[in-house]
């Protein structure tokens, strides 16, 4: 069984302005297949909070259907997410609820998909300590791709992978976190959460405290960080 520690917090600018957190995260740790999602509602859109929350739920909805088949592709999962997101929005216009979407999803048939639309980070640390960062795609003009903003399937960055093996860990983060992380320290971040934070009572609350007290001067953005890992010993952390 995999384990998860995750938290989303408002950034100082939203605290100051009395606005809600526009990030969202979700994880399902299942004995056969797991999913992890983080989303960042675009701050320029009036319903971005609803958009990011709907995207996490849509990813879960899509995953539950997609994992039933041993032959579903990464493209199939993404198409399901796109449709499910619009259904989850109900009467909210998609362009008012634009959000990034980063997904790790296992199908229970020996495969996993990494999928990313927009900025943020998906990184995987192997049991040997190696770290691989999933490549994001940009439009080249400093704008981020997002659900609810003009994009195509080709704007998603996605790849098939093996599911998490014992000792592996996955890090998903919105840009409020990822932009301040040093690539060479991603493995250390995962180790800190797994070996230190996860052993404390209320690990999610402890992580939220760390995110609110982010050690970068003048940080402003909402922050979401999710770490999912598969212990080497099922009875250990």
Which residue stretches match the model-derived regions?
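Short glycine- and acidic-rich boundary segments immediately preceding or forming the N-terminal edge
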Residues: 1-24, 28, 78-87, 94, ...
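N-terminal entry segment of metal-dependent catalytic domains or homologous docking segments
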Residues: 1-61, 120, 153, 157-161, ...
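Acidic loop->beta-strand submotif enriched in PP2C/PPM serine/threonine phosphatases
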Residues: 18-31, 94-107, 113, 138-182
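Short helix/loop capping segments that flank catalytic or ligand/cofactor-binding pockets
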Residues: 46-47, 124-125, 180-182
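Catalytic core of PPM/PP2C metal-dependent serine/threonine phosphatase domains
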Residues: 69-125, 155-162, 217, 228
